From Swiss-Prot:
Its biological purpose: IGPS catalyzes the conversion of PRFAR and glutamine to IGP, AICAR and glutamate. The HisH subunit catalyzes the hydrolysis of glutamine to glutamate and ammonia as part of the synthesis of IGP and AICAR. The resulting ammonia molecule is channeled to the active site of HisF.
Catalysed transformations (reactions): 5-[(5-phospho-1-deoxy-D-ribulos-1-ylimino)methylamino]-1-(5-phospho-beta-D-ribosyl)imidazole-4-carboxamide + L-glutamine = D-erythro-1-(imidazol-4-yl)glycerol 3-phosphate + 5-amino-1-(5-phospho-beta-D-ribosyl)imidazole-4-carboxamide + L-glutamate + H(+); L-glutamine + H2O = L-glutamate + NH4(+)
Organism encoding this protein: Gloeothece citriformis (strain PCC 7424)
Full protein name: Imidazole glycerol phosphate synthase subunit HisH
Domain Glutamine amidotransferase type-1: 3-211
InterPro entries, alphabetized: Class_I_gatase-like, GATASE, Imidazole-glycPsynth_HisH
Biological process, per Gene Ontology: L-histidine biosynthetic process
Keyword Glycoprotein: no
Amino acid sequence: MAVIAVIDYDMGNLHSACKGLENAGATPKITDSARDIEQADAIVLPGVGSFDPAVYHLRSRDLEAPLKDAIASGKPFLGICLGLQILFDASEEGSQPGLGIISGVVRRFRSEPGLTIPHMGWNQLEYTQANLPLWQELPFNPYVYFVHSYYVDPIDPSVRAATVTHGSQKVTAAIAKDNIMAVQFHPEKSSSNGLKILSNFVNQIRVKAIA
């Protein structure tokens, strides 16, 4: 079974993500060890909370360089929620620089009449990379579960893999570039659609291992 390093940096409950990966047929390993990251078949970076504490905790544990090295090596990577946002250069939420792996910034939803912030609950994805392996065998415009007040705004629009509309604002819900995949929603809370997304990620790891 594929061993997936699930990065522990004190930003949320990792066990629901691990359970989803186990159900998808992988062996998740919660870790903050550079050696584990290097030896794993793939990496999952979950996270809930605020941008500045997240990047602070990653850097205080000396995890920035191992993560960047693993991604640069081509290792499959899945970011979830805050684990998507900290891939970017900066956030309107804080002052700390992000990891800068994807060019762009994290923005807050604009206030508008009747709009609830945070965006919380079930909403539909619209694919912008319809043939992405992560979306295989999912229904058209599937419902997934969101909890966020901020969204990523990549400089290169081609990295967008899906969008979501909240009020009048259509924003990035997922990105994909080479071996990097990351989603704003919570697949581990998204019922059968979320489990399928995690299964598709695990299948990507198997395909890479065979290749």
